Design a protein with these regions (language model features):
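Hydrophobic alpha-helical connector segments
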Residues: 67, 71, 81-111, 166-170, ...
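Generic hydrophobic, amphipathic alpha-helix propensity
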Residues: 18-26, 43, 68-72, 76, ...
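C-terminal peripheral helix-coil segments that are non-catalytic and often amphipathic
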Residues: 1-6, 96, 103, 139-155, ...
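Amphipathic alpha-helical packing segments from all-alpha helical-bundle domains
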Residues: 74-77, 81-82, 107, 114-117, ...
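Helix-loop "lid/cap" segments that line or gate small-molecule binding pockets
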Residues: 83, 99-106, 116-124, 153, ...
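Short coil/turn segments at alpha/beta junctions that flank glycine-rich nucleotide-binding fingerprints
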Residues: 32-36, 87, 108, 155
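Short hydrophobic clusters on alpha-helical segments that form packing/core surfaces
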Residues: 18, 22-30, 101, 200
């Protein structure tokens, strides 16, 4: 029984490693040739495996794309939420949030391109573009941002404002940089990050008069 269990665990580990390899190849393919041209054959080529092997781990291209999207979002979310633990005040957490969101994408450009390719090109079985879908659940990063804004108001660090509106504005400013190649070319990540924090630091700061 022990040998059978060890064999099963080894097979499970190998299968998971192969799935991760295929997802990484999918990210690279989306970055290099875009969603429209990202066939299973192209993905297999970059993974260094046969095309049928992908079908062993994923039911079809849509399944692979959805799993890749889940991976992209979970990795980015984990990075930001882990960094937020470094802050002790709401203001510090706001700075860290902005820095972390921008820094992660700045150091994971392929992941950012792959995410954009999926969101703006993939469709549901009902032919609805992914970017038009409403969120079924709470986004961990948005939740973390709204929580730190709420904490800031409760502690008196931040003025009174609508939490959802402010969180949306902050997310929008971050997303604008990540999606605008011209802006990226003329404004450094560090400069944009500093300016965005300055803007929202002033926008959220409590009136001390």
């Amino acid at each position: 029984m022990t040998n059978d269990k060890e064999a099963d665990e080894r097979q499970s580990f190998i299968a998971e490693a192969r799935r991760e390899q295929i997802i990484e190849a999918t990210i690279a393919t989306l970055d290099e040739i875009g969603y429209v041209n990202a066939s299973l054959a192209q993905i297999a080529k970059r993974a260094g495996i046969s095309t049928p092997l992908i079908s062993y781990h994923f039911s079809d291209k849509n399944d692979l794309i959805n799993q890749t999207l889940t991976t992209l979002l979970s990795e980015a979310n984990a990075y930001v939420t882990e960094r937020l633990k470094e802050g002790s005040t709401a203001r510090e957490k706001l700075r860290i949030f902005i820095e972390a969101r921008l820094a992660y994408q700045g150091t994971h450009s392929k992941h950012n391109v792959a995410l954009i390719e999926i969101v703006f090109n993939a469709r549901t079985p009902d032919n609805v573009p992914y970017y038009k879908l409403s969120d079924d659940g709470e986004d961990p990063v948005v939740y973390a941002l709204e929580q730190l804004l709420t904490e800031g108001q409760a502690s008196g660090e931040f003025r009174e404002f609508d939490i959802h509106a402010m969180a949306s504005a902050i997310q929008g400013a971050i997303g604008e940089y990540l999606a605008d190649q011209y802006l990226i070319a003329i404004v450094s990540l560090e400069t944009y990050c500093a300016e965005i924090f300055e803007i929202f630091d002033r926008a959220t700061k409590a009136d001390r008069r």
